[in-house]
Amino acid sequence: MLDRRTKIVCTLGPAVASKEGILGLVNAGMNVARLNMSHGEHADHEANYRWVREATDESGKAVGVLADLQGPKIRLGRFINGEEMWAEGETVRITVEDVEGTHDRVSTTYKNLAQDAKPGDRLLIDDGKVAVVCREVDRNDVVCEVTEGGPVSNNKGVSLPGMDISVPALSEKDIADLRFALNLGVDMIALSFVRSPADVDKVHEIMDEEGRRVPVIAKLEKPEAVDALESIVLAFDAIMIARGDLGVEVPLEQVPLFQKRAIQIARENAKPVIVATQMLDSMISNLRPTRAEASDVANAVLDGADAVMLSGETSVGIDPQNVVRTMSKIVTNAEEGGKVPPLTHVPRTKRGVVSYSARDIAERLNAKAIVAFTTSGDTAKRVARLHSSLPLLAFTPHPAVRSQLALTWGAETFLSSEVKSTDDMMEAIDQSLLGMDKYKEGDMIVVIAGTPPGISGNTNMIQVHQLGQTLREQ
C-alpha cells in the first residue's frame, strides 16, 4: 500500500540511463517518469521509455510516463568568441538577422523580435542573470541598454516578460516530438509556455491525426498564463507550476502565492497539479538538501499538490535514488504532521456531489477504504482532491488510465477486467483486495462508480460494501 500520498515525478537523463538505474528510481519511490524533450535524441527517449516499462513490469508498480515538450524557447545565437561580458550601461543590439555574434551585436532565434518589441520592454537572458531594456527598434535590430550586466554565451535563453509575442503554441520540433511520443506510447504530454486555453487545440489536432488522445498538462510559466489561470485549468487535463521560467517572467515574490492559488483552483476542478523546479536543486551535487529546500517541498505538499517534481536532481545528479528517497521522507513527514486546507467550494455537478458524499459516508462509517471504479480516471480524481485520510483505491479496466492515475494524489491503482454489472464490479474488488494482507473478509469499503459500468463521466453510484459479501452469495 502507499504510505505516501503525494506523488513524485522524476526526470530521466544520463544519471539513470539504464534499466537498473530506472528500476532503482521506481523502487525508491518514483511514480511518474518524465522524458524531457528539450534534451536528448529520440533514441535516448525510446530507450528510457522501454526501461520504464520493463521496470514497471518487474516491480509490479504502476508508473506513468510523461513527455515534456520543449515549447517555443527563444534563444540568442552564437558568439564568435563563445562568450562576451555585457556591462551595465552598455548598448547592445539583438538582431533577427543571421549573424555571427560580437560583443555589440548578436542574433536571436525569434525572428519576430524586431516586430514585437517596443521601447521600454525588458529582455532577460539566461534565466534573468543578465537584463537589458529595449531603447529603440532599428529595422531588424532591437537596440538595448544593459541594466544588469554579466556573461552572455552561445544559445542562452531569452525571456520577454510582458511582451506580446507572436509565436505558435507548438514549434516544428514540438510537433515532431509530440508525434514521436504518442507513437511511443507515453501516458501524458506536458505543453510548455502555455499562454491561453486555446493552446491545447493544436495538441489535440495532432493527437487526432495520430489516432491517440492522452491527457495534456499545461505548464504555467508565462504572465499570460497567470492572467488566464482559471480558463487554462478548465481547458487542460492537469497543470504544472513551472516555477523556474515563471520566476523569471513574473516578479519572484509573486510566485509563492500564485502557487497556492493555482493549486486551489486545480483542486476545485479535479485537475491534478504538479509543483516543479529547483525543489531539491542542491542535491544535483550534494547528498543532503538545504533546509529551505526541505521546507519548499513540504509547503507544496501542504498546499495540496498532487505531485512534486525532480529535474536535474535525478537526470544528472550524483545520487538520483538518494534524492527520491529524501523527497519521499520529506513528503511523508509533511503529510503526517500537517493538514491541507479543505476545499470550500460547493459542488454543483452530479459527479462532484457524489464524490463528496462518498468521502463523507466512508469517513463517518470509518470504512477501510474508498474504492473508485473508473473508466476515464475522473471518478478517482474527484475523490482524490478531497484528501481523505482513508486509502483511495482506483480500479480501471484500462492500462493507460492506470498509468495516468500515477499522477493523482493518493490513488493506488488496480487493473481489473471489464465489468458488465455492479455485481461484477464488487466481485472484481473482492478478488483483488482479499488477496492482500491489509484487507480481510467483512471489512467495510465505500465504492463510488458509474452504473451501468463502462460509460465515461457517468459517476452516479455509491455503495457500502463488505468485502467477501459477493463471493459468499455465489
Annotate each PLM feature:
Residues 1-474:
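Non-catalytic helical/linker scaffolds that mediate oligomerization, partner binding
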